Curated annotation (Swiss-Prot):
Gene that produces this protein: gap1
The protein's role, per its UniProt record: Catalyzes the oxidative phosphorylation of glyceraldehyde 3-phosphate (G3P) to 1,3-bisphosphoglycerate (BPG) using the cofactor NAD. The first reaction step involves the formation of a hemiacetal intermediate between G3P and a cysteine residue, and this hemiacetal intermediate is then oxidized to a thioester, with concomitant reduction of NAD to NADH. The reduced NADH is then exchanged with the second NAD, and the thioester is attacked by a nucleophilic inorganic phosphate to produce BPG.
Record family assignment: Belongs to the glyceraldehyde-3-phosphate dehydrogenase family.
NCBIfam families listed in its UniProt record: GAPDH-I (TIGR01534)
Organism in which the protein naturally occurs: Trichormus variabilis (strain ATCC 29413 / PCC 7937) (Anabaena variabilis)
UniProt-annotated site: Activates thiol group during catalysis, residues: H182
Name this polypeptide is given: Glyceraldehyde-3-phosphate dehydrogenase 1
Catalytic EC class: oxidoreductase
Length: 343
């Protein structure tokens, strides 16, 4: 397979971790980074990470880019994606990780700039025009002739969808309520401050457990249409830096037991969802999953059963590292299918 040339727009938490996840992959070459922050600061943030540790590669800053193990990656600082030099840099795919260009119109500016495809590392605001693809769930629906812009949804949807798929495929999921207990993120302030849309979200991240809204559960229907109208959810933002956990309470169509649900999860984790869905029956806590590349890790010891049709299951996820690895996996899956279609 010819190397996939990738550009990154927005070198924040996800942008940097996508690069970390893919930098040693022989099938990927990063050809450009766009961010308003100067290259020397970007290099520093890439090299030293308070959550995931120091990058083991050699990192050096230049006036116009970053050098990683001798490989130079140009850095530019352009506000309008349509003016980016993706064509000149030879970018096949662009990871749109600013959080700003999540609809078709915004993401298509990268195509105007010469990119061939765009992967939005966030939920799309334009689900009717931008297909949502999750590795292990519906990535096989990628159509090279149509899907020039795709969304990888959110880290929480990536965690919930494999769990919901296993439940629905084996027992039928009739309705469910999800809660994600989510690590704090960059959008939250360190101390109390104003927040236009969400007053509670403006409270100090390190001081509070903050109830919040999330579209992650409803978004599962974008990749599993049979679950449309059957799932919704909410979030609690908690003062931990990384690793989150999904709690799904649900009814099944088929009478079953928690033991059978665990068996189905274990089978999927070793078979069709290997590498995507993990499984543990050990006495684990959140930090045990820091650096885990799975989208979702089913915790057999944490779930409960009320009766033969009503259950609660729990699944962990490294909301930064697991998600960033899925972005890389999705790009590789897409380019492989694209190259096969071209033969």
């Amino acid at each position: 397979m010819a190397k996939l040339k990738v550009g990154i727009n927005g070198f924040g938490r996800i942008g940097r971790l996508v690069l970390r996840a893919g930098i040693n992959n022989p099938n990927i070459e990063f050809v450009g980074i766009n961010d308003l922050v100067p290259p020397d600061n970007l290099a520093y943030l890439l090299k030293y990470d308070s959550t995931h540790g120091k990058l083991r590669s050699q990192v050096e800053a230049k006036d116009d880019g970053i050098v990683i193990d001798g490989h130079f990656i140009p850095c530019v600082s352009v506000r309008n994606p349509a003016e980016l030099p993706w064509g000149k840099l030879g970018a096949d795919y662009v990871v749109e990780s600013t959080g700003l260009f999540t609809d078709s119109e915004g993401a298509s500016k990268h195509l105007q700039a010469g990119a061939k495809r765009v992967i939005i590392s966030a939920p799309t605001k334009d689900p009717d025009r931008v297909r949502t693809l999750l590795v292990g769930v519906n990535h096989d629906l990628f159509d090279p002739s149509k899907d020039v812009i795709v969304s990888n949804a959110s880290c929480t949807t990536n965690c919930l969808a494999p769990i919901a798929k296993v439940i629905n495929d084996n027992f039928g999921l009739t309705e469910g309520l999800m809660t994600t207990v989510h690590a704090m993120t960059a959008t939250q302030p360190t101390v109390d401050g104003p927040s236009k849309k969400d007053w509670r979200g403006g409270r100090g991240a390190a001081q509070n457990i903050i109830p919040s809204s999330t579209g992650a559960a409803k978004a599962v229907a974008l990749v599993l249409p049979e679950l449309k109208g059957k799932l919704t959810g909410m979030a609690f933002r908690v003062p931990t830096p990384d690793v989150s956990v999904v709690d799904l309470t649900f009814k099944t169509a088929k009478a079953t037991s928690y033991k059978e649900i665990c068996a189905a999860m274990k089978q999927a984790s070793e078979g069709s969802l290997a590498g995507i869905l993990g499984y543990t029956d050990e006495e684990v806590v959140s930090t045990d999953f820091q650096g885990d590349t799975h989208s979702s890790i089913f915790d057999a010891g944490a779930g409960i059963e009320l009766n033969s049709n009503f259950f609660k299951v729990v699944a962990w996820y490294d909301n930064e590292w697991g998600y960033s690895n899925r972005v890389v996996d999705l790009m590789l899956s897409m380019i492989q299918k694209e190259q096969l279609a071209a033969v």
